[in-house]
């Protein structure tokens, strides 16, 4: 029984380490500074998607295919006025890439409210961040 509980808790911690979760104003700063679930000392790359219920169809769909990130979060702009104001979010979806808690790149939706970035573009930028940090 202990082995089953251990395996389930390990699976949950693994999924929480690389999944997509929701964040709010109250935990936003903690989450963008978050490190890997494995506790390594490598840089932390966190992606936050500012999301709106009315535009869910245009949200970034390939978050589970992005490689080299610590975590991917969504934040509902209707429930996060402070983060929305701080990062000057006007349209959803807007996607921000943070490295060690510092904003590296921002992709903003236009008037068409389409997702502002493709998987390939996002992956290329993440790879650039990782390459630049190796020196």
Q: Which residues fall in each region the model found?
A:
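Structural micro-motif
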Residues: 87-99
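Structural alpha-beta junctions
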Residues: 66-81
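Solvent-exposed loop/turn segments at secondary-structure junctions
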Residues: 53-56, 78-82, 103-104
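Local sequence-structure signature of Cys/Sec-based thiol-disulfide redox active-site neighborhoods
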Residues: 22-68
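Structural recognition of the beta-strand scaffold that forms the well-ordered cores
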Residues: 46-49, 94, 106
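Sec/Tat signal peptide C-region and signal peptidase I cleavage site
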Residues: 15-19
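Non-catalytic, surface beta->alpha helical segment in thiol-disulfide oxidoreductase systems
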Residues: 97-135
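Sec-dependent N-terminal signal peptides
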Residues: 4-13
């Amino acid at each position: 029984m202990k082995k089953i509980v251990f395996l389930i808790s390990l699976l949950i911690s693994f999924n929480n380490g690389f999944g997509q979760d929701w964040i709010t104003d109250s935990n936003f700063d903690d989450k963008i500074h978050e490190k890997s679930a494995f506790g390594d000392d490598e840089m932390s790359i966190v992606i936050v998607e500012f999301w709106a219920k009315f535009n869910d169809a245009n949200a970034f769909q390939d978050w589970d295919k992005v490689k080299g990130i610590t975590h991917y979060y969504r934040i509902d702009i209707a429930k996060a006025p402070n983060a929305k104001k701080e990062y000057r979010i006007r349209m959803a979806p807007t996607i921000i890439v943070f490295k060690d808690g510092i904003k590296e790149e921002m992709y903003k939706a236009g008037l068409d409210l389409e997702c502002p970035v493709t998987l390939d573009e996002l992956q290329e930028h993440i790879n650039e961040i990782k390459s630049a940090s190796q020196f």
